[in-house]
Amino acid sequence: MHDHLTKLYPPEQARSLQEGLQNLATDFAAAHPDLAGQARGLTADQSEVLLIAYGDQVKPRSGSPLKGLLEFMNQRLSGLTGLHLLPHFPYSSDDGFSVIDYRRVDPALGTWEDVKALGERYNLMFDAVINHISAESHWNKEFLAGNDRGYLLQSDPGMDHSLVIRPRTHPLLTTVETPRGPKHVWTTFSADQIDLDYSNPDLLYEIADVLLLYAENGARYLRLDAVGFLWKELGTTCMHLPQTHELVKLLRTFFDIAAPGVCLVPEINGTYEENAPYFGNGSDEAQMVYNFPLPPLVGPSFHTGDD
C-alpha cells in the first residue's frame, strides 16, 4: 500500500492511512476467513453468465422484490451463475446512481439478508458508486449545516476549468448555501450528484470500509462506477489521471489482503486505449473492465462470423 499512498498523499498522511487501511483489511480477513481464503485474482471464465437487473425487476405476489428476484432466477433462468444487481441503495435520482446511503438497502427492495440470500446462490456484482453521492445524503446535509468533513469536492469558480472533460451539459460547479457562506461543489453528472474529494485520506478510508461491507454481504464483483473521474486536478482533463490508477491499484492491494476473491471492474465508458490501462501490469490493478461497446458487438459478430 505504501507505494500507492505516497503517490497520492503527503508522507505523514500516507503513513497514517496505510496503518488504518492495513488494520481494516487484516481485521476483516480475520473476521471472514472464508473470504480471506479465496484465491487471488480473476476466477471467472467463459462459463460465468450474469443477469443484469434492478432489485425490483420482478414483482412478486408476496414478499420483498429481492426475494421475488431470487425465486424468479431459480425457477425461470437456468444456466445463470451470477447477478449484476444494479444500485439497490436509497437514492434520489439517476436510476439509483445518486446514492443517499451507501450502507443501507432501499427498504422498498428488501434487506441485506435478502441480498445475502442472492449471494448464496449466485456470484453478485454490486455497483460501487464512489465518484459522487446524493445531495440528499447525510454527508451533504452535514456539510450544508456547517460540519465540513472534507468529503465533498469544492472548487473556486474563478479558477480555469476549461480542460475538464464534461460528460453532461449542466454547470460543472453547483453553488450551495452554508453557514459559512456560499460554497461551490463539484458536480460532474448533476446538481444532485456531488463529487467526492479523494485528496482527503479520511474519505478514502471511509469508502474502503463501505466496499468491505459490500464484500461481507455477497459482492464478488465491484463495478467501480465512473471511476475515470475519481481524482481531479485543475489544469488537466480530470479524467483517467495517474492518481486515479493509483487509487484502483490501492483498492486491489487492499482487497488482496481482506478478500482476494473480490474482483474490481472499473466502468470506463471509453475507447480501448482508455480501458486497457486499468489492467495495470496484469496483476496489480483491475481484474476486468466494464466495456459498454462490447455487448452490442457480440450479436453482429455471431451473425457475420467476423470478430
Where would I find each of the regions flagged by the language model?
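Short, intrinsically disordered, charge-balanced linker/junction segments flanking boundaries
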Residues: 304-307
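Acidic/aromatic-lined carbohydrate-recognition and catalytic surfaces
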Residues: 2-205, 212, 216, 227-297
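A mobile, often basic/glycine-rich helix-loop segment
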Residues: 301
